Regions:
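Short, surface-exposed terminal/edge motifs of secreted or surface/virion proteins that either
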Residues: 12-22
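Non-transmembrane, interaction-prone segments in cytosolic or luminal domains
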Residues: 10-13, 53
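A short beta-strand micro-motif
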Residues: 3-8
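Low-complexity intrinsically disordered segments
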Residues: 23-62
Length: 62
């Protein structure tokens, strides 16, 4: 499953089902109806505002 993760200018980390867009104020928004998921700020420290959004792949481990 491919998703996108992006960090806002204020450090909020969000997971999106579709590629998000960034507002002029530095906040990432998805084109979905509230299916975005806010993650803990300390997760994925390699994702910064400057390199967002990042495409990630999630796999179930059995």
């Amino acid at each position: 499953m491919e998703l996108y993760v992006a960090r806002d200018k204020d450090g909020i980390l969000t997971l999106f089902p579709c590629k998000p867009y960034c507002s002029e104020s530095g906040i990432w928004y998805g084109e979905t109806d509230g299916r975005d998921l806010v993650l803990k700020k300390d997760m994925l420290p390699e994702v910064t505002f400057e390199n967002s959004p990042q495409k990630i792949e999630i796999a179930l481990i059995k």
